[in-house]
Structure formats: C-alpha cells, structure tokens
C-alpha cells in the first residue's frame, strides 16, 4: 500500500484545506472547490413534469437525479433525489430559474440549502444587552426544573434558594445558558397554570439577576413569556413551535426575543403517523419558522430543536441523532435535548438515574452531526465531552 485512501470532505473549508496541503495553485481554487463537495439533496412533492425537467437538466450537467418510475408516464407529484457536486448544483440552479412548473422556487430552495450547509459563526442579539455567539464551540444549556413532577429532577429545586444554588453550580461547571422550566411537559403530569408557572419562575430569576448568565425560559405560554422577558429572561424555549398558545408569538415580536422552536406532535397532532420522520419534522419546523418571520420576528433570532422524546419512537429518536445533519438545510442553529430521556433507558435497559453514559453518547453524536447547543442535566460531564468533541471536529487535516 502506498498510503492512498478515501478522504471525507464535508464542506468547502475542508476542501480548501486539502488543496492547500497538496500545494495546488490558488488560481485553480475557483474551478476545483465546487467539484470537491458532493451532496445528495432530497426535494419533496415535485410535480412529475417538473421532476422530468430537473432530471434532464441535472444529467446534462454531469450530475444525477432519481425520480419515481410513474413520473415518466403519469400526472401527479413525488420526491426527487439530486446527486451532484457544488458545480453541478450551481449550473442546475441557473437553468431552473428560467423554467416553468414552480421550478424557480425549487432553484431558490436548493440555493438556500447549499448556503446553509457551509459552517458559519453567528451572533444572536438578545434582550437586556446580552448576545449568544454560535459556531465557535458547542454551547451548554443546563436544565433547571422548578417543578414537583419533571421526569428526572422533579421536586428537587422547588425552593428558590435550592434552585439558585443549583444554577450557580451549573454555571461553575461550564453552562452557557440556564434553561428554567416551571411546568412539566411529561405526558402524565398535571400542567401548571400560567399564574403558578410565573410564581415559580420569578423568585428564581430575581435571585439570578446578578449572575452573568443567559437565561432561557421553558414555556409555551405568552403570558409567562412576557413576565419572564420583563424580569430578565433572554430566550424562550417553546416546546410547541408557536402552536400551543397564539399569544406567544406577539410577545416574542414585541420583545424581539430569541426563541427555540421545538418540534412536538404529542400535544399538537397526537396519533398522526409520520410518512418520513426527518422530512416531516423539517417541513413542520420550516412552517413554524415561516410563521414567525411573517409575523415580524427576525429569522436570525430563531433556533430549532427536532424534539427528541416528543412523539417519537425510541428508534425514531436514535434516527434523529444519526441524521441531525439533515436539519442544517433549514439554516438555523440546532439545539438537541436528549439528556436522560426514556429512549436512552429503553435502548440500554436503564432507569432515569443510570443514563449518564447514554446521555453523553448522545451529546457527542449530536455535536458531530451539527448541534450548536446541547441541553443537559449533567453539565460538568457534558462540558468535557463537548470540548473534546469540538476539538476533534475542528482539527485540521
């Protein structure tokens, strides 16, 4: 063997690094870089007439497109799998922009996906003079439940002094964000009312005011979000993607707050089966993003969460971790919250207090597949795993 080997190139930055190592003339970069990144892009619900045009155009550019057999013979619509380099896609986009059957919109979608796939740094401006810097390293969100019935730590931090002590511990352990929840989202729990939720939150927030920490509030209620944001909160972590309370979005727009949109069919579309788990979640998150932006919330204040543990099977949750990179096509920072969840227990046959290793494995996998923020109970251990994983992923060569 001579040392020849396959090399995995995930983006244009890595492609450029390889060309530099080889000693390629920089003048050749514009011609070589678009050929070095290969991507498969799945288009949803394309008319068969449009699918045939896409296939013909992609083939003529040297790429490939897979369409349904019936697309050649009948009317209707279906999915299309595109296969090609960045060069193929750029040529295809230029052609589709002048084609009928809605293909101009498809061209824009492909263009946006390709932009989103490249790594980037982003600063989200938050209320009260704070900002969230994403892209340099994985951020750690520490979980603080001030509830009697949360699945993992319910009842431990009902007293505000105990809650603040735990928050300070997590800050010392490396948390970048403290996510405070005052109403359990457990399926069998009795949901606290808005007044009770606020009464649990405000004493803790008041005592945390002196801490140099970003505070996220885990709520779907507009009334609670308003009270929290007016008392020092920076982010609203909405488990309902704006569908559980119509009053939440106007508050977010008014306060120009950052929001985490979590996918969740448990309370919203109970029992509705998935046709394609990942594609369906992407579509529903895309709808939520569009709804927020149309209402006046800047798109750069939105973070997405595929909602591990909410209306998915254990296998579905594992698949979401495996295919988390697919969600990068939405162009938003990604948060993952898998810590101590039941799918880990079902996979490993472990009770909730025995799920540390499974939770840490989920953290590492999520980061390797594109997570920007990990929401965890075990901050110190998760911080170490995140730091190690970040260093591996950022290593040159």
Residues covered by each model-derived region:
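N-terminal amphipathic alpha-helix/helix-capping segment at the start of soluble metabolic enzymes
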Residues: 1-34, 53, 93-97, 105-145, ...
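Active-site-adjacent loop and "lid" segments of alpha/beta metabolic enzymes
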Residues: 2-13, 45, 49, 53-56, ...
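Short, flexible, solvent-exposed loop/turn segments with mixed acidic/basic and small polar residues
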Residues: 25-35, 65-75
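Short glycine-/aliphatic-rich beta-strand segments at the starts of folded cytosolic domains
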Residues: 31-46
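Short amphipathic alpha-helices in soluble, non-transmembrane regions
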Residues: 58, 91-100
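Catalytic domains of carbohydrate-active enzymes, especially glycoside hydrolases
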Residues: 165-181
